[in-house]
Regions:
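Charged, amphipathic alpha-helical linker segments immediately N-terminal to NTP-binding catalytic cores
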Residues: 1-5
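Walker A (P-loop) phosphate-binding motif
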Residues: 9-49
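Residue-level preference for the first positions of well-ordered beta-strands
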Residues: 24-28, 52-54, 84-87, 113-115
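Short, ordered loop/turn segments at secondary-structure junctions
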Residues: 32-33, 58-60, 120
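Short glycine-/acidic-enriched loop or helix-start segments at secondary-structure transitions
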Residues: 39, 64-66, 124-127
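N-terminal phosphate/diphosphate-binding loop that engages ATP/GTP or pyrophosphate donors
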Residues: 43-94
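Phosphate-binding/switch loop-helix module in NTP-utilizing enzymes
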Residues: 90-129, 133-134
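Gly/Ser/Thr-rich active-site loops/lids in small-molecule metabolic enzymes
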Residues: 135-142
Length: 142
C-alpha cells in the first residue's frame, strides 16, 4: 500500500491506484533494483481487478517455468483467454530476452495492461546507463 497525503488526509492506495493504471497502458520499469518485484506487485494487484496482463522485457529477465518463449501471437492470445497473465520473451538459457520490435508491436495490446522490464543492472546495486539504456518501447504510455 501507498500513503498519499491529500486534502489534509492520509489515504491508503494500492500501487495500481497510485500509478493511475488504465486499460491499454504500457508500463516500463527500470532502475538498479526492484524491477521484477515491482512488476510482480503490479501484476498481482491488476489480476485482482480482473485485468489481463502481458509481462515481457526489452532486456533480459530470469525465466519462470511458465514463460512462453515461442514466437506465436495466437498462442499468447489463447493463453490470455485461459489465465490472467502471460510472461513472454525469447529463450535465452536461464533468462528470457526481448522479442524483436516488430513482434512486440503485434503483441503489446493483446492484454489490458503490458508490463515491461526495460533495464538491467545485472544484480548490481546501481548502474550508470549509456545512450542505449534503458530501452523504452517507442509507444510508451507510463
Amino acid at each position: 500500500m501507498f500513503l498519499e497525503y491529500t486534502k489534509k488526509k492520509l489515504i491508503n492506495k494500492s500501487i495500481v491506484e497510485y500509478l493511475q493504471v488504465k486499460n491499454q497502458d504500457i508500463i516500463s520499469v527500470s532502475g538498479a533494483g526492484g524491477k521484477t518485484s515491482t512488476i510482480k506487485l503490479l501484476a498481482k494487484n491488476l489480476v485482482r481487478e480482473h485485468k489481463k496482463i502481458l509481462i515481457t522485457t526489452t532486456t533480459k529477465m530470469f525465466k519462470t517455468a511458465d514463460a512462453i518463449t515461442i514466437r506465436d501471437k495466437n498462442l499468447l492470445k489463447q493463453k490470455l483467454k485461459q489465465q490472467n497473465w502471460v510472461f513472454t520473451g525469447q529463450d535465452y538459457g536461464e533468462k528470457i530476452s526481448s522479442w524483436d520490435e516488430e513482434f512486440l508491436r503485434e503483441i503489446i495490446f493483446l492484454a489490458d495492461i503490458t508490463l515491461i522490464e526495460a533495464d538491467g543492472a545485472k544484480r548490481l546495486p546501481f548502474k550508470f546507463p549509456n545512450k542505449m539504456n534503458p530501452f523504452i518501447y517507442l509507444h510508451q504510455i507510463k
